[in-house]
Amino acid sequence: MKSSELHRRFIKAGYKFDHAEGSHYFYIKDGVMTEPIPYHGAKEMGTGIANKLIRKYGIDGEGEQF
């Protein structure tokens, strides 16, 4: 999965961009901030980290929260 696709899923699931530190973005939802989410544009993200973040924050393939 491309890094930009993961970030689109976070936004679609209701997370709001809070701030960036270098190449890592932080999102916030219901007053809770996410851990740093790596952002490298169109580059492929490792499946392990992508799957970990999807499971941890409950985001399915369409960006909806489950």
At which residue positions do the language-model features occur?
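Short, contiguous strand/loop micro-motifs
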Residues: M1, P36-I37
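C-terminal structural segments of small proteins and small subunits
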Residues: M33, H40-F66
